């Protein structure tokens, strides 16, 4: 039997079971859990390689032919290292008709056993050796202010947005709301010309009939925002309509505690599922204790990325952002006090730890209204690095294997936001049957700059060189638009998410939309337990005087490799015996100045 060293094998075919690779310049490593390709039968494209006629490529089968369960693919990504909530493993990925059709072994079934997907004359190849593949990310907190957010999102690995807004109007600068049929229609019509999946949230304040009218117009969910009034009555009515129409509800709660405190908001929910934006509170919400919502099973807590991770610059940055985003006047003392009440270093420090415990389930941006859409993935991995550096390995992880922590963090901007908004049957993970929205990364650039972004099987953005060069790798090598963003391909490789009732009402024809419309579903049946790798509900309390966030000893167990007793010795205790979640701000971040000039 022929033998080959692991080094030579990885150079030829990419790493395999038991090998590890570092993610960017972070301290995180992933270890390959399994390899679904076949040693000695690897699919490789190129001169002298295996995917040629009569070898790994079958030249007799037509596009619709099958052999067993295997069929001819439109595109095969060979020897991909998949990083997903489902696992960290190596496989070929087969794409057909815009969807992931197979994950496993590609090749020619006339010559090779156990082929899951066929490379035929109709098949294109993308060489995945040495690259990491993740599902396209979701950003569920997007202010629909300007179309240029789309290429920025794609360049950060985000292929889907749950947004709200009307363009550069003041209401949209503050709130993610497309109010009423005209603006829902306008948002969907604009999205029809943009290379990204999108769904839009309507205004959640009002009586049942006008709220229902917006969902019937195609809104995929509702947004309750304090700038429009986050009262108990608004919460109750929005959730009542949502339950009848199976759409999600997102909430930005009452910072000023005018209509009640956090416990009154919780009571108004009546145990019904709701997606809580920026749970820490710097982005808005009951001051100072909105963070306590992480302990409830019906609340799906999220963060926005300006506070992630907690660094030496975080506090100073926030005051000016707040004044602009919420139409506040720095000359009015009450407006300044409003802004000051939202910036608390204690709860910001605790936010990172709660993410690491799996108590905050979702990451998002709050783009152009404090957050940055192109940094959702980057800041998620910076936070994971910070937590490992300050607290050590997650339970079950080991040297050169941070797989559990990586699965926890990748879930925060892929599968969990998809579940929260009823689109997880279409997107959010690399699983057979889902849309082929896939992001490729060179390991050294992981989390910072993708190599390419595939939308429904077609490359939309890719690292590419000078268009007038003799080869595609000549400088300047930058992310550029590809054919997936042009012509009918644009509308054929993205979708819009709408309410089921809107779709049944014929809005596609009424609005003259070209993109496929997909209905959101199962929004009302999910809860915190539905969140992959992020379903913890610690008994958190925030001290109203000191703003310290503290949990019980039991909440520290089964989190880290170090024991809860060892960790407890390092944490300060409250007078009631709880343990304060605290960490030093980061002074130097990975995936930062080594990769970006600005």
Curated annotation (Swiss-Prot):
The modification N6-carboxylysine is found at residue 223. GO terms for biological process: urea catabolic process. Its main location: cytoplasm. Its cofactor is Ni cation. Gene3D superfamilies: Metal-dependent hydrolases (3.20.20.140), Urease, subunit C, domain 1 (2.30.40.10). Pfam families: Amidohydro_1, Urease_alpha. Ni(2+) 2 binds at residues 223, 252, 278. Substrate binds at residue 225. Pathway: Nitrogen metabolism; urea degradation; CO(2) and NH(3) from urea (urease route): step 1/1. Ni(2+) 1 binds at residues 141, 143, 223, 366. It catalyses: urea + 2 H2O + H(+) = hydrogencarbonate + 2 NH4(+). Transmembrane segments: none annotated. One of its GO terms (cellular component) is cytoplasm. It is found in: Cytoplasm. HAMAP family: Urease_alpha. Belongs to the metallo-dependent hydrolases superfamily. Urease alpha subunit family. This is Urease subunit alpha. It comes from Ureaplasma parvum serovar 3 (strain ATCC 700970). The lineage of its organism: Bacteria, Bacillati, Mycoplasmatota, Mycoplasmoidales, Mycoplasmoidaceae. The gene is ureC.
């Amino acid at each position: 039997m022929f033998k080959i060293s692991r080094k030579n094998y990885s150079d030829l075919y990419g790493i395999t079971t038991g090998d590890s690779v570092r993610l960017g310049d972070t301290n995180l490593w992933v270890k390959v859990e399994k390899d679904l390709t076949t040693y000695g039968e690897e699919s490789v494209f190129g001169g002298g390689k295996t995917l040629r006629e009569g070898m790994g490529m079958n030249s007799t089968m037509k596009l619709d032919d099958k052999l067993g369960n295997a069929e001819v693919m439109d595109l095969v990504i060979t020897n991909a290292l998949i990083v997903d909530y489902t696992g960290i493993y190596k496989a070929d990925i087969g794409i057909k008709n815009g969807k992931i059709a197979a994950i496993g072994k590609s090749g020619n079934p006339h010559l090779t056993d156990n082929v899951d997907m066929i490379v035929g004359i109709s098949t294109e190849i993308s060489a995945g050796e040495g690259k990491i593949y993740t599902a396209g990310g979701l950003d569920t907190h997007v202010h629909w202010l300007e179309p240029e957010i789309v290429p920025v999102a794609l360049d950060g690995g985000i292929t889907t947005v749950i947004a709200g807004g009307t363009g550069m109007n003041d209401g949209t600068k503050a709130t993610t709301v497309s109010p009423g049929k005209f603006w829902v229609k306008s948002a969907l019509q604009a999205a029809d010309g943009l290379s990204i999946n999108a769904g839009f949230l309507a205004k959640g304040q009002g009586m049942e009939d006008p709220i229902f009218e917006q969902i019937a117009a195609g809104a995929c969910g509702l947004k309750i925002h304090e700038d429009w009034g986050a009262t108990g009555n608004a919460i109750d009515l929005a959730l009542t309509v949502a339950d009848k129409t199976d759409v999600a509800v997102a909430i930005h709660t009452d910072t000023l505690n005018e209509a009640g405190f956090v416990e009154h908001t919780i009571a108004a929910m009546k145990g019904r599922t709701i997606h809580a934006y920026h749970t820490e509170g710097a982005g808005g919400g009951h001051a100072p204790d909105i963070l306590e919502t992480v302990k409830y099973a019906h609340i799906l807590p999220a963060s926005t990325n300006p506070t992630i991770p907690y660094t030496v610059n975080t506090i100073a940055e926030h005051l000016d952002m707040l004044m602009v985003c919420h139409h506040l006047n720095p000359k009015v003392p009450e407006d300044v006090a409003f802004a000051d009440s939202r910036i608390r270093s204690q709860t910001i420090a605790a936010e990172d730890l709660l993410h690491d415990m799996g108590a905050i389930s979702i990451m998002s941006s709050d783009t152009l209204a404090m957050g940055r859409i192109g940094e959702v993935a980057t800041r998620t991995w910076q936070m994971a690095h910070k937590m490992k550096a300050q607290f050590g390995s997650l339970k079950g992880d080991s040297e050169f294997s941070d797989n559990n922590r990586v699965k926890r963090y990748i879930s925060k901007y892929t599968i969990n936001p998809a579940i929260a908004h009823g689109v997880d049957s279409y997107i959010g993970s690399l699983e057979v049957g889902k849309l082929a929205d896939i992001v490729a990364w060179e390991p050294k650039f992981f989390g910072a700059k993708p190599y390419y972004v595939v939308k429904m099987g077609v490359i939309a953005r890719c690292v590419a060189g000078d268009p007038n060069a003799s080869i595609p790798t000549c400088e300047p090598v930058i992310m550029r638009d590809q054919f997936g963003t042009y012509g009918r391909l644009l509308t054929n490789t993205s979708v819009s998410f709408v309410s089921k009732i809107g779709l049944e009402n014929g809005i596609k024809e009424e609005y003259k939309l070209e993109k496929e419309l997909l209905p959101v579903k199962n929004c009302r049946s999910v809860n915190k337990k539905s969140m992959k790798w992020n379903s913890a509900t610690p008994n958190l309390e925030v001290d109203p005087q000191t703003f310290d966030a503290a949990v019980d000893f039991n909440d520290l167990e089964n989190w880290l490799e170090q024991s809860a007793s060892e960790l407890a010795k390092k944490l300060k205790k409250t007078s009631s015996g709880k343990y304060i979640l605290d960490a030093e701000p980061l002074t130097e971040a990975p995936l930062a100045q080594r990769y970006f000039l600005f």
